[in-house]
Curated annotation (Swiss-Prot):
PANTHER family: CXYORF1 (PTHR23331), WAS PROTEIN FAMILY HOMOLOG 2-RELATED (PTHR23331:SF5). Residues 349-465 are annotated as: VCA. Pfam families: WASH_WAHD (PF11945). Component of the WASH core complex also described as WASH regulatory complex (SHRC) composed of WASH (WASHC1, WASH2P or WASH3P), WASHC2 (WASHC2A or WASHC2C), WASHC3, WASHC4 and WASHC5. The WASH core complex associates with the F-actin-capping protein dimer (formed by CAPZA1, CAPZA2 or CAPZA3 and CAPZB) in a transient or substoichiometric manner which was initially described as WASH complex. Interacts (via WHD1 region) with WASHC2C; the interaction is direct. Interacts with alpha-tubulin. Interacts with BECN1; WASHC1 and AMBRA1 can competitively interact with BECN1. WASH genes duplicated to multiple chromosomal ends during primate evolution, with highest copy number reached in humans, whose WASH repertoires probably vary extensively among individuals. It is therefore difficult to determine which gene is functional or not. The telomeric region of chromosome 9p is paralogous to the pericentromeric regions of chromosome 9 as well as to 2q. Paralogous regions contain 7 transcriptional units. Duplicated WASH genes are also present in the Xq/Yq pseudoautosomal region, as well as on chromosome 1 and 15. The chromosome 16 copy seems to be a pseudogene. It comes from Homo sapiens (Human). Residues 382-398 have a biased composition (Basic and acidic residues). This is WAS protein family homolog 2. It is found in: Early endosome membrane; Recycling endosome membrane; Late endosome; Cytoplasmic vesicle, Autophagosome. Residues 1-167 are annotated as: WHD1.
């Protein structure tokens, strides 16, 4: 016969060893015991074989990791004594698959040996007769589960009880001409008198709802302290960095590369949003204004000869249209005005008294003409005085060039002066033409006011010469 196999296994459990039933015949009990022991031997063999396979797999993984460690250690020992800088390129992500392999049980795919077909055994002995006394004696030794849970008592109902099945509307639940639901609370109510008599004791106890106590700020008249709001804005702070005073080069240090130089400005700092300090701007010397006066005197002190009328006079008038109405004077007066503007020396009284901003050369020229009194007040100079003044100015230029020869800005200014002379068509040794003088006057700044002299004496000297 085939023994009855009882399943006492959990969900997901692969193996289930059969139990031997009590009160079996001798031959039947021996057969079931032999079958259970064989089944247990197969199960234990399968379990230990799977554990051995898992241990071998883990041992191979540990061996592969050990080989990687030994290889890395050999590389480290190779570069350990080197004094050259080595760049190490590392991946931005951890070297692992995006999705890890899920854990699998070692009993995955195992089959239950008990499902295999086993041989059938024929037993010749007969069943024993049922003995009720022996069955009662077994009840004393084995616990029997008896339900001893007390039945719940019916709670006292306040209303009429459950709803009847023949009620067709909600109004049938209410007392006549009232809003009292008798199935919920049973009361005696006279619709005409309005008096209510409660029958249940619990209905007589009325609970008064009281308000909660007032807060301490009202009851004790205490003023709450104003809480300072917390600031959750991010304020980066570099903190205090210790200053280390070490030499810039330390030779023959073990494990330190000597062919690598670090630059402080390689990238943004650790706190790029922190308010940085504004770098100090370089200061410039204001010595440029002094050679500028020399250039102005150069350009102003080269007037055209007085006898013929100067041809560039119409150019000046055309280049400065917003002149006052006094510009419509004869050509002779224009020549006199050119002479007066070109001879701006310390002996001239009508020179401009203020130096205008050098940003606009033509505007300053017109302003100086207006301050000098226009063309009508121009003064004529003799040829001898102009030649003497020209020699003095050349000597002053040479002295200043020698005294300021090492200054970068003065050298640059002298080069610009020479370039202007070359563009205007006059070299360093050639005489200056009237066109170049007026062009330079228009691009320059008027000089500072010289010491004033009596106008009458100046007029007499000019006319006598």
């Amino acid at each position: 016969m085939t023994p009855v196999r009882m399943q006492h296994s959990l969900a997901g459990q692969t193996y289930a060893v059969p139990l031997i039933q009590p009160d079996l015949r001798r031959e039947e009990a021996v057969q079931q015991m032999a079958d259970a022991l064989q089944y247990l031997q197969k199960v234990s063999g399968d379990i230990f074989s799977r554990i051995s396979q898992q241990v071998e797999q883990s041992r191979s993984q540990v061996q592969a990791i050990g080989e990687k460690v030994s290889l890395a250690q050999a590389k480290i020992e190779k570069i350990k004594g080197s004094k050259k800088a080595i760049k190490v390129f590392s991946s931005a992500k951890y070297p692992a698959p995006e999705r890890l392999q899920e854990y699998g049980s070692i009993f995955t795919g195992a089959q239950d040996p008990g499902l295999q077909r086993r041989p059938r055994h024929r037993i010749q002995s007969k069943h024993r007769p049922l003995d009720e006394r022996a069955l009662q004696e077994k009840l004393k030794d084995f616990p029997v589960c008896v339900s001893t849970k007390p039945e719940p008592e019916d709670d006292a109902e306040e209303g009429l009880g459950g709803l009847p099945s023949n009620i067709s509307s909600v109004s049938s639940l209410l007392l006549f001409n009232t809003t009292e639901n008798l199935y919920k609370k049973y009361v005696f109510l006279d619709p005409l008198a309005g008096a209510v008599t409660k029958t249940h004791v619990m209905l007589g106890a009325e609970t008064e709802e009281k308000l909660f106590d007032a807060p301490l700020s009202i009851s004790k008249r205490e003023q709450l302290e104003q809480q300072v709001p917390e600031n959750y804005f991010y304020v980066p702070d570099l903190g205090q960095v210790p200053e280390i005073d070490v030499p810039s080069y330390l030779p023959d240090l073990p494990g330190i590369a000597n062919d690598l130089m670090y630059i402080a400005d390689l990238g943004p700092g650790i706190a790029p949003s922190a308010p940085g300090t504004i770098p100090e701007l370089p200061t410039f010397h204001t010595e440029v204004a002094e050679p500028l006066k020399v250039d102005l005197q150069d350009g102003v002190l080269t007037p055209p000869p007085p006898p013929p009328p100067p041809p560039p006079a119409p150019e000046v008038l055309a280049s400065a249209p917003p002149l006052p109405p006094s510009t419509a004077a004869p050509v002779g007066q224009g020549a006199r005005q050119d002479d007066s503007s070109s001879s701006a020396s310390p002996s001239v009284q009508g020179a401009p008294r203020e130096v205008v901003d050098p940003s606009g050369g033509r505007a300053t020229l017109l302003e100086s003409i207006r301050q000098a009194g226009g063309i009508g007040k121009a003064k004529l100079r003799s040829m001898k005085e102009r030649k003497l003044e020209k020699k003095k100015q050349k000597e002053q230029e040479q002295v200043r060039a020698t005294s300021q020869g090492g200054h970068l800005m003065s050298d640059l200014f002298n080069k610009l002066v020479m370039r202007r002379k070359g563009i205007s068509g006059k070299g360093p040794g050639a005489g200056e033409g009237p066109g170049g003088a007026f062009a330079r006057v228009s691009d320059s700044i008027p000089p500072l006011p010289p010491p004033q002299q009596p106008q009458a004496e100046e007029d007499e000297d000019d006319w006598e010469s």
